[in-house]
């Protein structure tokens, strides 16, 4: 069989797969008679409301000299680590705004960072295709730098995100531009499992984000530039357990819902979506129309402790607070006093749900605290 014939057969098979996928999508839409917001309205659910003092900027963390790309909170809620284009990781005391560590990175092109569950170590990765681990208790060297305690090498593309397995300082999952996710044993520095990639059923484009279920740490979800999100079981690396369709652009961010049965996605297409991992159904779309025709991309997202609120960062500097039940925007932090002056690149909620931190291309991080008549939701 000639190369031309093989290409023709491949194109025909691809078209068949796409046709079947579209039929499956239409069938699911027929069976799904309502979405979450429709059901909530039918049950008489009232919308969440915010007053002018219910979520306010209480801290501005200044110290980076380049765009902030990533942030993460410690489980004990009072420290934040941030990664910036300036080639540094900074660990902040969220209560005082003071810097406790400033780590100069071996590679300045960092894209992601994460705190270990114990808060004793931080991880980061970027265009060097390596995930570097720093022990915050290690002494600095003669040049005043923190030494790398472990380098996790094995990816063939940039490291786009990393997250420690809950309650474990010894295992971590990374996603990469090489279309794979990897579970690492930090103690040995070796790959425990590789998810996707050549000869495996996985993503067909760069993987941008991962989120591990807190209720079942064996499960994690990944989002990719192939417009899909996939559910994985760490015990079965050869294939994804589920594949979720619906987006029309790169999936930039994924986040598990607090109960572990659902997860959210955010995309270049300007939408966030809520999926159920048990039924594979899309439960809700969160989209705010823009009159000027320019659709801002979703960059980051986080759920409140109860899941009733969804915080979403956008490329135009908006940061919407969504009512997840009614699919309504209840507040835009991009339009209030002390809002960021650039793209919202990352955000995260403290462990107790009492504060939100946002990071931006304006080089700053801001901490937003619940106050007024609004308690933690």
Swiss-Prot record:
InterPro entries registered for this protein in UniProt: G-protein_beta_WD-40_rep, Gprotein_B, Guanine_nucleotide-bd_bsu, WD40/YVTN_repeat-like_dom_sf, WD40_repeat_CS, WD40_repeat_dom_sf, WD40_rpt
Record Pfam families: WD40_Gbeta (PF25391)
Q: Which UniProt keywords apply?
A: Repeat, Transducer, WD repeat
Q: Which SMART domains does the record cross-reference, listed alphabetically? A: WD40
Show me the WD repeat boundaries.
63-93, 105-135, 154-185, 202-233, 246-276, 293-323, 339-369
Top-rank taxon, per record: Eukaryota
One GO biological-process annotation of the entry reads: G protein-coupled receptor signaling pathway
| GO MF annotation list | signaling receptor complex adaptor activity
Q: Which GO terms describe its cellular component?
A: cytoplasm; heterotrimeric G-protein complex
Report the protein's function: Guanine nucleotide-binding proteins (G proteins) are involved as a modulator or transducer in various transmembrane signaling systems. The beta and gamma chains are required for the GTPase activity, for replacement of GDP by GTP, and for G protein-effector interaction.
Spell out the subunit comment: G proteins are composed of 3 units, alpha, beta and gamma.
User: Which PANTHER family does the entry mention?
Assistant: GUANINE NUCLEOTIDE-BINDING PROTEIN BETA G PROTEIN BETA
Query: What family does this belong to?
Result: Belongs to the WD repeat G protein beta family.
UniProt protein name: Guanine nucleotide-binding protein subunit beta-1
Q: Which organism is it from?
A: Nicotiana tabacum (Common tobacco)
